[in-house]
């Protein structure tokens, strides 16, 4: 069992691996053509003479018994040519001197990130090959790669962990939050994964939203990782990654970050 960078000859095998993969993982390639584009992007990034972060990607595969059973990736300079949008969960304090009243409210608010960062993503393992340290190996290989060539990466490293979904693989948070802004027929489940930052910025007000009016099931899962992503979440924490208070716009999964030189 070992991890290496993806090669062009891996295209069909990678596509076979991910074609029936997790529909909620928006960074997974959607077609064989896109798989080939990702591999080419990775190869081009690796062969750059000027080794600095510049919208690069590195795609890795995990092989076991001569079979590709998992993939993962690194993306640099995220938000360099456009902002990244999250919800930031925080406390808003209100007070009245007249009535000697104070209260702390739990709110979420759109938060844009403009400074470039490196993102860890696209971690996917075949269901039959999950466990026994495979996910850790696939993920930790990225840290080793970054340690060998730190000049290729931004100083801030971010990992978005998938949030909770229902039995039909729909985002619990989005189901309850979005109904305040959009009709049910605006999106089907597949289209939700293609919602981009521009759409969010244009369609949702910038002021803070109280968490309390949301359905209780939606409130409870803000910033909580999906059960399948919990091992990855714990592994990232063991490597010194910490929550930055931001969550994904769609599934409200937690966002972790760490400085490149502080990763264990």
PLM feature spans:
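A short beta-loop-alpha structural element at the N-terminal edge
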Residues: 2-14, 27
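Helix-loop element at the rim of GNAT/NAT acetyltransferase active sites that forms part
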Residues: 16-32, 42-50
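Conserved beta-strand in the GNAT
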Residues: 59-61, 67-76, 119
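Conserved acyl-donor/pantetheine-binding loop and adjacent beta-alpha core of acyl/acetyltransferases
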Residues: 76-122, 181-194
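Conserved GNAT acetyl-CoA-binding A-motif
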Residues: 113-123, 146-162, 172, 219-223
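Conserved acetyl-CoA-binding loop-helix of GNAT-fold acetyltransferases
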Residues: 125, 131-146
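Glycine- and acidic-residue-rich phosphate-binding/metal-coordinating active-site segment common to enzymes
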Residues: 138-141, 148-192
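Long, charge-rich C-terminal accessory regions
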Residues: 181-264
């Amino acid at each position: 069992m070992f991890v290496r960078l993806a090669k062009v000859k891996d295209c069909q095998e990678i596509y076979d691996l991910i074609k029936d993969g997790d529909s909620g993982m928006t960074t997974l390639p959607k077609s064989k053509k896109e798989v080939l584009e990702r591999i080419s992007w990775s190869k081009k990034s690796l062969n750059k003479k000027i080794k600095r972060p510049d919208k690069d990607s590195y795609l890795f595969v995990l092989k076991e018994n001569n079979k590709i059973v998992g993939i993962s990736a690194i993306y640099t300079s995220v938000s360099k040519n456009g902002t990244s949008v999250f919800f930031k969960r925080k406390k808003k304090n209100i007070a009245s001197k007249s009535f000697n009243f104070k209260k702390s409210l739990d709110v979420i608010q759109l938060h844009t990130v403009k400074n470039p960062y490196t993102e860890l993503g696209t971690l996917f393992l075949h269901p039959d090959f999950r466990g026994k340290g495979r996910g850790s190996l696939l993920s930790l290989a990225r840290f080793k790669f970054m340690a060998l060539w730190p000049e290729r990466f931004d100083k801030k490293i971010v990992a978005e962990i998938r949030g909770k979904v229902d039995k039909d693989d729909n985002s619990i948070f989005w189901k309850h939050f979005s109904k305040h802004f959009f009709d049910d027929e605006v999106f089907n489940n597949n289209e939700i994964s293609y919602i981009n930052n521009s759409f969010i910025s244009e369609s949702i007000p910038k002021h803070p939203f109280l968490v309390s009016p949301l359905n209780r099931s939606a409130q409870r899962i803000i910033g909580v990782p999906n059960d399948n992503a919990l091992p990855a979440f714990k592994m990232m924490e063991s490597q010194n990654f910490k929550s930055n208070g931001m969550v994904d716009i769609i599934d409200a999964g937690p966002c972790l970050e760490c400085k490149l030189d502080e990763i264990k």
